[in-house]
């Protein structure tokens, strides 16, 4: 599975979560954190998709995705430990931890594999 197949939906989920946090609680931190990280993740996914279309890999995009997902895992994990609230801290930490593992796997296996041309 290519990283952008999960990255773009993950980024959209972060953006939507940031907006929901802002609408429900008026939290500017949720809006900035969710929308900011979500936009960066979507951008990295888009860069990875465009590289794949050119039959190249984008290590930089995958590294950016990994750093963001790992940071969200840590920050939201700490928040969960302090508040014990499943929504949104544990949910975001859990999804981000899964994404971090996926990205580390993609980096370890050489990124998106480009299928050979059929002749």
Curated annotation (Swiss-Prot):
Note: For all TMEM14 proteins, 4 hydrophobic alpha-helical domains are predicted. However, NMR structure determination of the human TMEM14A showed that only 3 of these helices are membrane-spaning while the amphiphilic N-terminal helix is probably located at the lipid micelle-water interface.
Chief subcellular location: membrane
Cystines in this chain: none
Entry-linked PANTHER family: PROTEIN FATTY ACID EXPORT 5-RELATED, TRANSMEMBRANE PROTEIN 14, 15
Bilayer-crossing regions: 27-47, 57-77, 85-105
Function text: May be involved in free fatty acids export.
Membrane topology: Multi-pass membrane protein
Similarity comment: Belongs to the TMEM14 family.
GO biological process: cellular response to hypoxia
Signal peptide extent: none
Cellular compartment(s): Membrane
Keywords: Membrane, Transmembrane, Transmembrane helix
The gene coding this protein: FAX5
Record's protein name: Protein FATTY ACID EXPORT 5
Any Gene Ontology CC annotation: membrane
């Amino acid at each position: 599975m290519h990283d952008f197949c999960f990255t773009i939906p993950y980024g959209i989920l972060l953006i939507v979560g940031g907006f929901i946090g802002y609408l429900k609680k008026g939290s500017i931190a949720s809006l900035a954190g969710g929308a900011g990280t979500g936009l960066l993740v979507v951008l990295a996914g888009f860069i990875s998709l465009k590289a794949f279309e050119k039959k190249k890999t984008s290590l930089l995009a995958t590294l950016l995705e990994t750093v963001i997902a790992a940071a969200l895992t840590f920050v939201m994990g700490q928040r969960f430990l302090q508040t014990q609230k499943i929504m949104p801290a544990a949910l975001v930490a859990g999804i981000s931890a899964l994404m971090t593992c996926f990205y580390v796997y993609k980096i370890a296996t050489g990124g998106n594999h480009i299928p050979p041309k059929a002749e």
